[in-house]
């Protein structure tokens, strides 16, 4: 399995594929695990854990769709709201140190767009860095995952309607690269580079579109 994009989504996809028996090549145009938007995120992650006050995925979805003002994909939003609590717990098991209340429960705070104290964080504005570090640790210890840095994807290779790999090039040498794969997972982020000002890295350019 080829996973294109070595940010949080790509690292988790690579880990999941390896856990299901696949041999994985995880590639990124930067250093795998050091690029993307997640590592730069400082503040909070929304998850209906209900640690501070009653909450649940259904209310989280209502808030998400209302804040999205018609721009959200409802199916994807529902999937996000339903799965976020288990992912927060999983990251906790992977040593992400969420901020705590005095009673030991995970601290949750209000954030714009939410009707509940729902958002979790790591102290000292290190939420994204802590998540990325935990994921890097998981993939670095998995022998089924090979990492390939400084390679950017340019196209998918197809045969009779099936995707059989991808093409790209090594950024440092401009050498063309062709990768054969039985499956390709695109985790290439958005296209915030189209804006003059953005809080995301300036190389998130929408290559996966």
Question: Locations of the language-model features?
Answer:
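Hydrophobic/aromatic ligand-binding patch that stacks against planar heteroaromatic rings
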Residues: 12, 16, 36-37, 184
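A glycine- and small-aliphatic-rich helix-loop capping segment at beta-alpha/alpha-beta transitions
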Residues: 19-22, 33, 46-48, 199-206
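Alpha-helix N-cap/helix-initiation motif
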Residues: 6-7, 124, 174, 194-202
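Conserved N-terminal/central alpha/beta ligand/cofactor-binding core
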Residues: 29-172, 187, 193
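N-terminal Rossmann-like FAD-binding beta1-loop-alpha1 element of flavoenzymes
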Residues: 1-26
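Core beta-strand elements of the Rossmann-like FAD/NAD(P) dinucleotide-binding domain
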Residues: 173-183
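Glycine-rich loop(s) and the adjacent beta-strand/alpha-helix scaffold that form part
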Residues: 183-209
